[in-house]
């Protein structure tokens, strides 16, 4: 069975609706961390974008889920639908192949 990890970085305000949507889409577990970061816009708001603007790290949520490879497109579509506003700060999605998973309690791989 091929697995992938989908990692999402988005604003704190979007987390609750994203969590509900992922649960409804069949995601059975997730890891969530509060992080600080910014993208190429250096943490600016849309009306502030400036080449010389000093980088500002903004509070974000980082959500990681592991799903079967055949579920990736469906889950990514759910994420994009929940996060999209068309404005700076909607978020980022990263997708990684998982080589192996070991359940510590049982040793199952």
Please report, for each region that a protein language model flagged, where it lies by residue.
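Positively charged, small/polar-rich N-terminal and surface patches that mediate targeting and assembly
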Residues: 1-109
